[in-house]
Amino acid sequence: MTHDNKLQVEAIKRGTVIDHIPAQVGFKLLTLFKLTETDQRITIGLNLPSGEMGRKDLIKIENTFLTEEQVNQLSLYAPQATVNRIDNYDVVGKSRPSLPDRIDNVLVCPNSNCISHAEPVSSSFAVKKRTDDIALKCKYCEKEFSHYVVLAN
């Protein structure tokens, strides 16, 4: 029996590959991080086989590179993600997200009375690591939430 080891998602010449995204999280990342607001080609692999994770999602964005801040903001959704910088089809840089002190312009406050819902302000949350959870504190209403509550919002 032979194995066909072809790439399931086409290689890119230059850009960013976000690998090892938990299955079912890829689309959420595209939306939250506004990754689709570009005219560059984006390739998405959903529920791909993974030796480590069983199944995983993958995002490839041509001619686009994530900032360190963007990479670190991925840590809430995909703490095991690997962000690869590609040039001329080769991996020229590799990074993993680490939990930032603050997450701006990405999340929505779950408090329906928060002023961030009525005013044209950018969301901003302080990140506080707990023993068994990560808490996020809204800059505007100053309420603290488990990151699971904010992510589900």
From Swiss-Prot:
GO molecular function: metal ion binding
InterPro entries in alphabetical order: Asp_carbamoyltransf_reg_N, Asp_carbamoylTrfase_reg, Asp_carbamoyltrfase_reg_C, Asp_carbatrfase_reg_C_sf, Asp_carbatrfase_reg_N_sf
Co-factor requirement: Zn(2+)
Pfam families assigned: PyrI, PyrI_C
GO cellular component labels: aspartate carbamoyltransferase complex
Keywords assigned: Metal-binding, Pyrimidine biosynthesis, Zinc
Signal peptide feature range: none
Cofactor note: Binds 1 zinc ion per subunit.
Highest taxon of the lineage: Bacteria
Residues holding Zn(2+): 109, 114, 138, 141
BP terms from Gene Ontology: 'de novo' pyrimidine nucleobase biosynthetic process; pyrimidine nucleotide biosynthetic process
Family that this chain belongs to: Belongs to the PyrI family.
Biological function: Involved in allosteric regulation of aspartate carbamoyltransferase.
Assembly description: Contains catalytic and regulatory chains.
Name of the protein in question: Aspartate carbamoyltransferase regulatory chain
Organism: Citrobacter koseri (strain ATCC BAA-895 / CDC 4225-83 / SGSC4696)
